[in-house]
Regions:
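Short hydrophobic/Thr-rich beta-strand motif most characteristic of the beta2 strand and flanking loop
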Residues: 48-55, 63
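Receiver (REC) domain active-site loop signature in two-component systems and cognate sites
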Residues: 78
């Protein structure tokens, strides 16, 4: 588990190993809010990830084939093509069906989570997110699970 800067960890080596596994993971962040995009970019770049930013679903669909991200964060409430439609289009494409899509929303309702699952999202993250929650979410999908490493 990642902790905030200056917090004690079980082992500094363990933390460094954890962060090194995130290094070079390519992450696409789709959000119409420049503040959210920039916050996510700062947190992810600090962890060594490569970050691709998109302002809306159409922008994301144009970039996904070129960049082939390992993980996609997708805001629900966006103009033109909302997050549900964007996620659905990504998951219907055989090339990107296996790419994890994490829905971002300022609402933490059961309906929003269920609707996200219905269009194929893999997880749901409530905004505002913390650095730790963002990196742990990426790690969930990028790092091998304990069963794969045993």
């Amino acid at each position: 588990i990642l902790r905030g800067a200056g917090s004690p960890t079980r082992s500094e080596g363990g933390l460094l190993a954890y962060l090194s596994k995130l290094r070079d993971a390519k992450v696409l962040v789709i959000d119409d809010s420049n503040t959210i995009r920039r916050s996510a970019e700062i947190f992810l770049v600090q962890a060594g990830c490569q970050v691709v930013l998109a302002e809306d679903g159409f922008d994301a669909l144009a970039k996904i084939a070129d960049h082939q991200p390992k993980v996609i964060f997708c805001d629900i409430m966006m103009p033109r093509l909302d997050g549900y439609q964007t996620c659905s289009l990504i998951k219907k494409n055989p090339r990107f069906k296996a790419t994890p899509v994490i829905m971002l929303s300022s609402k933490d309702g059961l309906f929003d989570r269920a609707r996200g699952r219905m269009v194929g999202s893999d997880q749901y993250l409530t905004k505002p997110f913390t650095k730790d929650s963002l990196l742990q979410t990426v790690a969930t999908f990028v790092l091998p699970s304990a069963s794969e490493t045993s």
